[in-house]
Amino acid sequence: MRPSHAHSYADLLSILQVSSSHTTVPKEEIYDLLGIGYGPAHLALSIALRESTEANEANFKSHFLEKRGHFAWHPALLLPGSQLQVSPLKDLVTLRDPTSTYSFYNYLHSHGRLARYINKEQGVPSRREWTSYLAWAARRMNDAVSYGQDVVSIEPLTLASAAPDAKQDVL
């Protein structure tokens, strides 16, 4: 576990000061990782961090800011009959951890639709079903994201402002 006051060069590159147009987010919160936007890639990253023993033991602090008021994935492309263009095995977690509770198949199981999905002739979900899966996973990660946050600036912190009592020769 790294000491909370020690910052490596890589840490300093990822420590950011965020100013938001909303006052619901602290103006000067410090994170090890701050994600701007909360689409499928950042959703998958936030899940991976939550499930990471190493990140949890190191008290790795991450958060994500999303401009929209809720999770959405290409809402304009939810056309009737449209199908996902990739394998559902490329969901948010399966390639990293097939036993994760955030998998597409766990989503189907928890909604009582796994058997029906497996028995379908076509093993590719509709875009509507995939969107529902992503939203389900995002709701389970609500504490990792602040919605309705319009980020207006990002400024790197200096070593002195990130850890005033740290030695300047850390870099």
Pin down the residues of each PLM region.
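A short, basic/flexible loop-to-alpha-helix module at the beginning of a structural domain
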Residues: 8-31, 54
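Short, solvent-exposed loop/turn segments at secondary-structure junctions
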Residues: 40-41, 69-71, 152
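A conserved short coil-to-beta-strand element within the FAD-binding core of flavoproteins
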Residues: 147-170
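Glycine-rich active-site loop/strand segments that organize a redox cofactor
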Residues: 9-18, 61, 65-131
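Rossmann-like flavin
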Residues: 66-71, 134, 142, 159
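N-terminal Rossmann-like FAD-binding beta1-loop-alpha1 element of flavoenzymes
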Residues: 26-63
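Helical element adjacent to the flavin cofactor pocket in flavoenzyme catalytic cores
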Residues: 128-145, 151
